[in-house]
Amino acid sequence: TVGDLWPLYLENGKPKRKDAWKPRYRADLEAMAVPGGEKKKRGQGVTRPGPLYPLLALPLAGVNEDTLKGWYDREAEAGKHQAARALMMFRGFLRWCAARPEYRSLTDRDAGKAAAIVESLPSNTRRTDALEAAQVPGWWAGVEQLSNRTASAYLRALLLTGARREELAALTWANVDFQWRKLTIADKGETTRMIPLSPYMAQMLATLPRVGPYVFASTGKAGRITDTRASHAKAL
């Protein structure tokens, strides 16, 4: 079954010319196939199965355009972009199987590329809001001058840490360790990761008012910063 081969793929399917998966990507591969049913670390209830988990029970020879289309349509109901990312990862698995003589005859390498599936994928829009290296000094100076000090610190912290917007917006004071200079950031899934807290950023965060559990607090309903587009536009 796919479930028998998936661990072998994780162990041996590293990209060409590389010694190993990138740790973050390897973790994402594992998360995509978890069975779920575990108690959530945050909030109530149990975790959902990973998008790829339903495919693990299939025999490799049973993975074809029809089975993948049915699987993708079901997963897309929970989230199109997550389902699309899972599909891209599974394509890598099929390529790996097709490249191995012992699995080649059982593998439909192009099952995930069928027109019926590709036409259902969400369109990828090229980002136009990314900063070029030459723009950073001017952008930084503009952000520093913002009257909203919380928005100013938040925007600079995004650039300094490389964290996702929602991850950083949800940062609480309990997850800021000024003594050991680190931040604990909640990932998309149920995991966390550590980010070093530079002296500059530590000083910047220390100037923010502690008016609630969130570092980047707001008077809005969420209690934390949610939309900085207006402040960002002023800095540009």
For each feature predicted by the language model, list its residue ranges.
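Basic, Lys/Arg- and aromatic-enriched nucleic-acid-binding interface segment
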Residues: D19, E75-R91, A99-A170, Q179-W180, ...
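Residue-level detector of conserved, well-ordered beta-strand and adjacent loop positions
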Residues: K69, W140, A186, S198, ...
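A structural signal for short hydrophobic beta-strand segments in well-ordered beta-sheet cores
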Residues: A174-V176
